[in-house]
């Protein structure tokens, strides 16, 4: 059996653990066979040793929420006047793009992600072409086919199109598909129920944007405010539409969405009842720290969510509201700006929590025997003090040296490492 051994000065098998001068053994077909202190093995033609030197090997970083379709839309330096103004601008820009434009921007975003250490991402696809665009990209993708329809009469039409997209075979071994009703202000109750039933029947995840803004809370509670004006301006608010009169989480709970292992994106504004409801289900929350800051939201309740035991993963959102698609940049932002979060919590959110959210928690997110060998390798400065390694990493020491997916080097800044097909 052919075996590859990856060695480095530091290995983080999972958050809260650190090994020094360690080796990760990978056997065909790309699973971890063991971790151990490094000792030179006897010569063996079936063993290839990849020495990353002064580096950290950690579980592959997981971007649990992104929109690669918006990679062409760099966020403005100036904060938008309102969320709906920003949303309207995104809609206008997207209407100008051709299919080729969208495909190119998706590929560009995937390659930026891979080069920053991401091995698995949750991609929202509103165009329906993400799976085809990403078929040659060497990272894992869970692609959420997005649906939008606030008019009840359009729910059937939206579901027919969604089923058609989901029935297409996955184009590569690293792709799988799921469903994403966009948000409570853009999806009718009928469509939410139908997508939840579809996700249940297909044994897959459902992702939805939720409790993202105060204006969303107002719209669902009373039907007034910024979102009403926005939807009326688009001609998207059905005649006689009535608000549910509930907080976003309670609303989706009533519709049965929380009965699934749902992925609740953002959750910037949650009351205690909402958090208790999330805790009582097998749902995950995805926190997008720098996008959250871009819109000037109040502090995210991530500390409370973690204390309650809710699974919180990290996402970058899109370049329309962020500076990069790097999960490592999100981690470092949190280290600088959320002093209430510990290093191991930040690492956990970027690895195993993301894997759990996307449904890969039993095979990804840790460096453990039997798990897929998805790893991020970060080059560390020579002469680094041999203490508080995780803190130094999050302070900014280290840059992405390689991204390894299923035991194969998918990207590296050291091209010589690609020789031999490791």
Give the residues covered by each predicted segment:
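Histidine-rich, glycine-flanked metal-binding segment
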Residues: 1-5, 12-58
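Alpha-helical scaffold segments that flank or form the walls of functional sites
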Residues: 56-57, 74-137, 158-172
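Histidine-centered catalytic micro-motifs
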Residues: 59-71, 205-214
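Active-site gating loops and adjacent loop-to-helix segments of metal-dependent hydrolytic enzymes
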Residues: 72-104, 138, 142-148, 213-261, ...
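Active-site glycine- and acidic-residue-rich loops that bind
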Residues: 123, 180-196, 204, 210, ...
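Glycine-enriched alpha-helix->loop->beta-strand junction motifs that scaffold or abut catalytic
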Residues: 137-141, 196-203, 257-260, 277-286, ...
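His/Asp/Glu-enriched, well-ordered alpha-helical/loop segment
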Residues: 229, 254-258, 287, 298-384
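C-terminal cap of metal-dependent C-N hydrolases
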Residues: 356, 372-422
